[in-house]
């Protein structure tokens, strides 16, 4: 299940509204809402999301979660043509292996992607220069 389908369903359940009622409130077919919840349809348009937020009077946090989930649920995306060719090769490998990735592998990949942010947050350690001794003859 996509993040949007899950978030949409969880919000509807939290507000205690049946699909049929929500369809009437929003002016959509109940079958369309069902298709969204069971992930047969990709995330809906921003207009749909705004209407859902408005009709249920969602909080800012819920609205933010819904938009984040919609973005995460996009099934197609386009690579910027200016990217380094290694990115294209990496994405080809990712597409081929996505169905077989374990949760551990997915979490590791996400950690690696966040590594730059983590490194930026750590303070830079200053290295003290080594003091050299003056040239002296060794005692024997």
Regions found by a protein language model. Give the residues of each.
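Conserved hydrophobic/aromatic packing and binding residues within compact polymer-binding modules
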Residues: 8, 22-23, 33-36
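Short alpha-helical "recognition helix" segments of helix-turn-helix
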Residues: 20-23, 52
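A short, Lys/Arg-rich alpha-helix, primarily the initiator
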Residues: 1-14, 108, 139
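Short, charged recognition helix plus adjacent turn
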Residues: 64-97
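Recognition helix of helix-turn-helix/homeodomain-like DNA-binding domains
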Residues: 27-43, 51
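C-terminal regulatory/oligomerization modules of transcriptional regulators
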Residues: 89, 94-140
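DNA major-groove recognition helix of helix-turn-helix/homeodomain DNA-binding modules
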Residues: 47-65
């Amino acid at each position: 299940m996509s993040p949007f389908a899950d978030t949409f369903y969880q919000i509807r359940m939290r507000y205690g509204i049946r699909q049929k009622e929500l369809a009437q409130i929003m002016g959509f077919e109940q079958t369309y809402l069902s298709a969204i919840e069971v992930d047969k349809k990709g995330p809906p348009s921003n207009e749909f999301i705004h209407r859902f937020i408005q009709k249920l009077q969602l909080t800012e946090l819920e609205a933010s979660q819904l938009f984040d989930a919609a973005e995460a649920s996009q099934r197609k995306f386009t690579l910027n043509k200016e990217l380094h060719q290694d990115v294209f090769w990496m994405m080809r490998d990712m597409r081929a292996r996505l169905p077989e990735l374990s949760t551990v592998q997915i979490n590791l990949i996400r950690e690696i992607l966040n590594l730059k942010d983590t490194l930026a947050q750590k303070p830079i350690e200053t290295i003290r220069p080594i003091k050299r001794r003056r040239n002296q003859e060794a005692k024997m």
